[in-house]
Amino acid sequence: ELDRMVQTDYQTQVSRLHALWQRYPDCEIVAEQNSMGGPIVEALQNAGLPVTPFMTTNISKMRIIDGLVLGFERGDIHIPRDPVLIGELQAFEGKRLPSGAMQYSAPSGMHDDTVMALALAWSVRQDAGPLVLMSV
């Protein structure tokens, strides 16, 4: 399911994630722990939800984005016709650093929240088979 929680307070986010977890009790919740994600990870843990924190660094981001690209190339990922997700995927870009590593991000002034959410979902799901996101 694709559920954006833009400008949503932590308690509401925890409540909505708890409701999703009750519908899908075998799911794995993965949340970025960086900056603003730290308090939500803590709130999810305090609520007793099974959350795995993910620390986003250039290297960890490169790993999950490379995996996402491969999943799309193989046809293992199917996404809803969500204009925000599709727009973010189309705008997302990679730049080669002087070190040779890739740095991935949204262009200046844009967001990559749904791209990162999809990449995180795929990174934990890929060993279990295809990923299908549905609009509900």
Specify the residue positions occupied by each region the protein language model found.
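RNase H-like, metal-dependent nuclease domains and their acidic two-metal-ion catalytic environment used
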Residues: E1-M55, M62, D66, D76-V136
